[in-house]
């Protein structure tokens, strides 16, 4: 199902689909959204504001060509080149914004509903955030 009106995310420059949630399948226990990026213009790349969740989130980035995304994890920014996976522990302020290219991100929130709060401040994560190779610090 198309997914619009996600808190802390601007309407453009991508297409979003809701793949799984407690609303679609009661008791699913996960919220899975597919984000499709296609050569996003520079003025629309910062579409996601820092936010946090009370549950862990996993972001999987994939492309058939090239996709580079800047990911904020707490106070650290990393540049992720697809294919890559990012673990975002509960309570960690985070945001993901396209730098260049085209591809998809599958956001898997380990909660059946999308719930987020403002990501200002350092957060209260109990675990370490992490990225898979390939990634490089900005």
For the regions a language model picked out, list residue spans one by one.
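Non-cytosolic beta-sheet module surface loops
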Residues: 50, 62-63, 98
């Amino acid at each position: 199902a198309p997914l619009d009106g996600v808190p802390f995310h601007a309407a453009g420059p991508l297409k979003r689909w809701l793949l799984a949630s407690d609303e679609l399948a009661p008791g699913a226990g996960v919220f899975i959204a597919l984000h499709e990026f296609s050569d996003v213009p520079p003025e629309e790349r910062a579409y996601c504001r820092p936010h946090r969740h009370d549950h862990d989130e996993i972001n999987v980035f994939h492309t058939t060509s090239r996709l580079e995304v800047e990911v904020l994890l707490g106070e650290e920014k990393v540049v992720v080149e697809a294919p890559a996976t990012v673990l975002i522990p509960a309570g960690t302020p985070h945001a993901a914004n396209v730098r260049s290219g085209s591809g998809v991100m599958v956001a898997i929130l380990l909660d059946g509903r999308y719930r987020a709060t403002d990501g200002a401040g350092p957060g209260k994560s109990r675990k370490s955030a992490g990225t898979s190779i390939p990634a490089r610090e900005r």
